[in-house]
Amino acid sequence: MATIKVKQVKSRIKCPKDQKRTLDALGLRKMNQIVEHEANPAILGMVEKVKHLVSVEK
């Protein structure tokens, strides 16, 4: 499968708890942190949930 790079571009402060947990599950804990994941449906669903906080590169 293809891989995607996910970068946190906005702060998690004042976000609902479920969105904070989603960022944790993606491995994003700090601003401007980049993680690489396989583009499977589970990861893409998590990215969709926090799309206003992250940017995605293929």
Curated annotation (Swiss-Prot):
Keywords: Ribonucleoprotein, Ribosomal protein
GO BP of this protein: translation
Subunit-structure text: Part of the 50S ribosomal subunit.
InterPro entries (alphabetical): Ribo_uL30_ferredoxin-like_sf, Ribosomal_uL30_bac-type, Ribosomal_uL30_CS, Ribosomal_uL30_ferredoxin-like
Protein name as annotated: Large ribosomal subunit protein uL30
Signal peptide: none
Family: Belongs to the universal ribosomal protein uL30 family.
One GO MF term attached to the UniProt entry: structural constituent of ribosome
Origin organism lineage: Bacteria, Pseudomonadati, Bacteroidota, Bacteroidia, Bacteroidales
Annotated GO CC locations: cytosolic large ribosomal subunit
Species whose genome carries this gene: Parabacteroides distasonis (strain ATCC 8503 / DSM 20701 / CIP 104284 / JCM 5825 / NCTC 11152)
Entry keyword annotation includes Nucleus: no
Pfam families with a match to the protein in the record: Ribosomal_L30
